[in-house]
Amino acid sequence: MAGRTMQAARCPTDELSLSNCAVVNEKDFQSGQHVMVRTSPNHKYIFTLRTHPSVVPGCIAFSLPQRKWAGLSIGQDIEVALYSFDKAKQCIGTMTIEIDFLQKKNIDSNPYDTDKMAAEFIQQFNNQAFSVGQQLVFSFNDKLFGLLVKDIEAMDPSILKGEPASGKRQKIEVGLVVGNSQVAFEKAENSSLNLIGKAKTKENRQSIINPDWNFEKMGIGGLDKEFSDIFRRAFASRVFPPEIVEQMGCKHVKGILLYGPPGCGKTLLARQIGKMLNAREPKVVNGPEILNKYVGESEANIRKLFADAEEEQRRLGANSGLHIIIFDEIDAICKQRGSMAGSTGVHDTVVNQLLSKIDGVEQLNNILVIGMTNRPDLIDEALLRPGRLEVKMEIGLPDEKGRLQILHIHTARMRGHQLLSADVDIKELAVETKNFSGAELEGLVRAAQSTAMNRHIKASTKVEVDMEKAESLQVTRGDFLASLENDIKPAFGTNQEDYASYIMNGIIKWGDPVTRVLDDGELLVQQTKNSDRTPLVSVLLEGPPHSGKTALAAKIAEESNFPFIKICSPDKMIGFSETAKCQAMKKIFDDAYKSQLSCVVVDDIERLLDYVPIGPRFSNLVLQALLVLLKKAPPQGRKLLIIGTTSRKDVLQEMEMLNAFSTTIHVPNIATGEQLLEALELLGNFKDKERTTIAQQVKGKKVWIGIKKLLMLIEMSLQMDPEYRVRKFLALMREEGASPLDFD
């Protein structure tokens, strides 16, 4: 049918303006027909028609969105012709529609189910014409939405013929909505509309992970496992498209607690997590900064941290970006409630405020709180439950592989500029630096650099750099080894000075009893290293005073080559209260649990217990603490050897402490003249002739003297003139009650 000229008019009713139809008088066209409206030779628009008596014959009425789309003005003359669809090619298979609230004042954050929307759309607009770029108004759940047709695909012609689908889909500009057309809704850019359900397009999401990051660039070494665990627990759900997460009913992890010894990379890891993510810059807060002298200000500071996240969630709902808040030293503000002295309860209300913000009545799903501490025991337990800081990750001392990575990172610049000597073997350094934290390894590299630089400084009246030699500056293996020996000692390692004083005179193997003690000690060391069934091995060396128990314990510890050796000795706790003693002992054991292999020597147990026979008196608090620590197994994957020493086995028996040790080894005194002569020969203080004289007096006789006391007597007698030495030594032996020696 040839076209006719008609005049554009305003849509007569609001109801008709929601129908997406052009409205005519029934004298002109019939309801349900389709027309092509031509506004110029190159601009054609297809509309479906409805009739209404209030429209003047010769006029065609359009709604405001239709007039906008077709560029029509009221009263404009346009050419209108009937249009018929080719059902084989122009039935809509799928149509993508951009959706947003029609009026900004009606915005809300309620979720809208796209499946229900699609069903309503097909019902309202069945058998209607749609074109790419068309604008229309859609009413759903008493809300008005503005729609824009983005893309149309024709239905597979095979389906229309009742045959199996051929999989061919063709893009078309104009199509007809039929009962089995599919509609996919796409949220308009910057819209706060919250769409749920399957009938929505997959949004072009920016990955939250930065594409160009790697561990070495981040300066993190030795934390691969920890990082992958954090990623699995905290970020895996955020990488997936929101619609899949929504279908699973999955909630994102909101909090991570990183804990472990100082200098192992907690702060570094948290800082780099922020860089790894394509999120906004994280807010980094030092725990004590939150506190304020004014009432209520501390709580307000917590609220300010979460204000941006709350505002964005209110505006964008599920599509809000990720907000990261990092609390360094979180134990400063999140101590156990009720543990702080004073009547103000400021700390308690700060904890309460933080608890309610992370997971309170109004839940935020767009935050990630990272807390760091080396005292996780101080933190309120309500903060550690799932839904709050639920991922608890220990950032412990790096193993050999981790130390290798860390040293690689800290020497990378030197290697790049050829300042690292060829004789430096990073693998060797990684083996030698047992129980070094990341910060201590960085300190080692710094110390080696300063040693190398020091070689090129002229030692004169002025401090000058020898520029000729400075050009050839190289950090050598010797620099690293010197720094390892003199400058950097690991906090959780073995300080040789601790036990060197106990074995400064060496171990005098005066007989089988000493050899047996050392052999048994070696067996226990091997058991600790190799046995999976006994991660905790404890041994008590008991014997009379001055028999060398502490020296033997220190020797067994030294020979073990464990990376962590500590001596818990009463001489370091002089004047301590009972509570302070318990805390000092607990700290030594807690530090030991952080190392893969540890040895703790508990020296002179009866002195630790404040035992005196008069009364008798002892500290029950220290006794109970020690009993618990002796029996407590180390964490999984860690092994601990405890060596105790005592001169009062009978007292420990009464206190029921002997049962706390796996085994007991007796360390005897020198008991025979032959053993005494063997000890004198090994010490080498007396000449052969002098020893022969002593032998005549002691051979075949019983003696009873500790090796420590023997050393003291020998040193005293050596202060005499040579001819009186032997006489003095034998006299001292007799005075000590070592034996009833008869001599002239």
UniProtKB/Swiss-Prot annotation:
UniProt-listed Pfam families: AAA, AAA_lid_3, CDC48_2, CDC48_N, NSF_ATPase_lid
Binding site for Mg(2+): T550
Gene3D superfamilies given in the database record: 1.10.8.60, 2.40.40.20, 3.10.330.10, P-loop containing nucleotide triphosphate hydrolases
Residues that bear Phosphotyrosine: Y259
SUPFAM superfamilies: ADC-like (SSF50692), Cdc48 domain 2-like (SSF54585), P-loop containing nucleoside triphosphate hydrolases (SSF52540)
Disulfide bonds: none
Record's subcellular location: Cytoplasm
Residues with PTM Phosphoserine: S207, S569
Cofactor note: Binds 1 Mg(2+) ion per subunit.
Post-translational modification comment from the UniProt entry: Phosphorylation at Ser-569 interferes with homohexamerization.
Signal peptide positions on this chain: none
Gene Ontology molecular functions: ATP binding; ATP hydrolysis activity; ATP-dependent protein disaggregase activity; ionotropic glutamate receptor binding; metal ion binding; PDZ domain binding; protein kinase binding; protein-containing complex binding
One Gene Ontology cellular component annotation held by this UniProt entry: Golgi apparatus
Chain positions with N6-acetyllysine modification: K105
EC number: 3.6.4.6
GO BP terms: intracellular protein transport; positive regulation of protein catabolic process; positive regulation of receptor recycling; potassium ion transport; SNARE complex disassembly
Transmembrane segments: none
The keyword Repeat is annotated on this UniProt entry: yes
Cofactors demanded by this protein: Mg(2+)
Annotated positions binding ATP: N505, G506, I507, I508, K509, W510, P545, H546, S547, G548, K549, T550, A551, L552
Family: Belongs to the AAA ATPase family.
Subunit structure: Homohexamer. Interacts with GABARAP and GABARAPL2. Interacts with GRIA2. Interacts with PLK2, leading to disrupt the interaction with GRIA2. Interacts with MUSK; may regulate MUSK endocytosis and activity. Interacts with CDK16.
Function (record text): Required for vesicle-mediated transport. Catalyzes the fusion of transport vesicles within the Golgi cisternae. Is also required for transport from the endoplasmic reticulum to the Golgi stack. Seems to function as a fusion protein required for the delivery of cargo proteins to all compartments of the Golgi stack GRIA2 leads to influence GRIA2 membrane cycling.
Protein name: Vesicle-fusing ATPase
Gene behind the chain: Nsf
